[in-house]
Swiss-Prot record:
Listed name of the protein: Mitochondrial import inner membrane translocase subunit TIM50
Any one biological process term the GO annotation gives: protein import into mitochondrial matrix
Organism whose genome encodes this protein: Yarrowia lipolytica (strain CLIB 122 / E 150) (Yeast)
Subcellular localization: Mitochondrion inner membrane
UniProt cross-references to PANTHER family, sorted A to Z: DULLARD PROTEIN PHOSPHATASE (PTHR12210)
Amino acid sequence: MHSLLRAAQIARVARPGVKRAMTPAVRFYSDKKTEKSDQPFQSSLLNDDLLAQAGMDVDESKGKSKPAAEGKSEGAAEGATEDDVTDEQRARWAGTAKKSTDQTSKQESRERIAGYGYYAFFAGSAAFAAYLARDWDNEEDKKKHDTIGQGYTPMLMWARLKARIGDTFSFYRDPVAPVLLPDPPAPPYQRPLTLVIALDDLLVHQEWSREHGWRVAKRPGVDYFLGYLGQYYEIVLFSSQYMANCEKLIMKLDPYHAWFSHVLTREHTTYEDGKLVKDLSLMNRDMGKIIIIDPDTGCTMKQPENSIPIEPWKGTPGDKELVKLIPFLEWLVSQNVNDVRPILKAFDGTYLPDEFTRREAIAREKFEKDWYAKHGKDGQWASKFLGVSEPKQQKPLMPHDVMRREGQKQYQKFLEYLAVEGPKLKAEEERMIAEQKAMGPKNLSEAVSSIGSLPPVPQQPTEPKA
């Protein structure tokens, strides 16, 4: 090895300098290329003389063949060039030459295993799809998908496949229960109409900023809207948020559970076409006696005829749009209607508060004119006979005017009741919650051990001895 290094140093020193010709740097394609030199190409500086001086056997080094990595056979390495190889030799060597690759055997094995995995995945998917496309095998599926029959035609198989896949994701698409509200109370305690209202951008507005984080604004007139109409309507709060996110906010709006008869959240919505839908047909109420107020039109897409349109509130102070709906809603409940949908359709395409005010003014003018025509001169003869002045007549009241006067009195009385009894009711509720927590498991191990066990039998009171 030392001799080889010494010979390389001698060759580097003894090599004469090569003068470069002053040729132009730019060559045109029209110029003729120089012919190849007939002299053999010297692949190494270690020629025979230098190897001999270093003590190497020149004949032995010539007899060794080149490595197989250079892609040439032994015969070609002895002096045969690429032009000397015949087509017959190329054809014979084609099957024996190893494909050049940078991958190791482990990488090739991994790719082969991955290919088998792909085949197994696609085969398993096809088998699972065929299993899902089978005929209905129970009466529940037949009843649920009564429009899809039995058989193994491509259309029926595809329909059953989609139906079963849809049933798999129904947990995220359908509400938590097929019926959202319990049965209504008995007639003496049942409200004549049900009012479904949204939470976001109707009663409150939530916004987030880097400076303050989340902030919630309550719409002006919300307390009066809920407290006053709660006397006549079964108010159902239907929020698009999850219960875990809006529970504290609802408790702030109704701390004594006085306004909302029921509370529904996002878990009770239906997911259709990328939108959250509040399906009123699942509320266990007469569809002719349900009204929904929601600024999101996508939530009311299934029953738009039961909806009162309203613009979303963005936190503007001094807003009165919600309070403007009270006269129409109190008039509607005073009419004892069997179906509110034709009445709401009559206001379609108009701004309901202003349109109702205009129509009410016309009806009031006619009502007062008829009343004065009937009662205007009653009692005038007695006043003239006795020589006293005529009493000043008050304007006649329409039926919903009388209801409004009595309703406001009852609303004030109820506020006074809550001011006195509300804290007591809140304290009683907190006490009951604390008792329930005390009766429950105190840690996870107790909760796991209590699964499947029967509740403790209450002790019977002993009779006192005589």
